Design a protein with these regions (language model features):
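Hydrophobic alpha-helical segments, especially transmembrane helices
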Residues: 3-4, 31, 137
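Processing junctions and N-termini across compartments
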Residues: 18, 126-129
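Extracytoplasmic c-type cytochrome modules immediately beyond a signal peptide or single-pass transmembrane anchor
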Residues: 24-127
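Bacterial N-terminal signal peptides that target proteins for export
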Residues: 1-10
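N-terminal signal peptide c-region/cleavage motif recognized by signal peptidases
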Residues: 16-23
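The canonical Cys-X-X-Cys-His
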Residues: 128-140
Length: 142
């Protein structure tokens, strides 16, 4: 009779540890993606100054790709010890909407860069930055 109880306890411990490990992995992955996103924003600024629209396009594509999957990197319970505000999970639809706004802003930048219109691309970059800032204000602790 004790054997199934012990087995159940061991299974629960293993499952709990694997969840903890998965959570730690997703946190590290999302931090790496946010750092890459920040590097892309800096690269876009420099490329735009040089009217290097190919780089603007490729870096904005990276941002758009990250925005599409960003919410997947915030599973329930992955906020402990991070700068992620609880609002991410209490307003997950709003968080997903913010990621979608970021995606659309990146797509607008891609469209402007493909036209090789520096003025329009500059406006699109500012709009993209505004989506980052809005999300950070609502969902990130500083």
């Amino acid at each position: 009779m004790r054997r199934p109880t012990l087995s159940a306890a061991i299974a629960a411990t293993v499952i709990g540890l694997s969840s903890l490990s998965a959570s730690a992995g997703v946190i590290e992955d999302r931090k790496a993606n946010f750092k890459a996103n920040n590097a892309s924003m800096r690269a876009i600024g420099a490329a735009l100054s040089a009217e290097d629209f190919e780089t603007v396009t490729s870096e904005a594509q990276k941002i758009a790709a990250w925005a599409m999957v960003m919410p997947d990197y915030f599973p329930e319970g992955s906020g402990e010890g991070t700068s992620a505000k609880p609002a991410i999970w209490s307003d997950f639809i709003g968080f997903k909407d913010a990621a979608e706004a970021n995606y659309h802003a990146a797509e607008d930048l891609i469209a402007a860069a493909r036209k090789q219109d520096a003025g329009q691309a500059g406006e699109a970059l500012r709009a993209l930055g505004a989506t980052c800032k809005a999300c950070h204000q609502k969902f990130k602790s500083w």
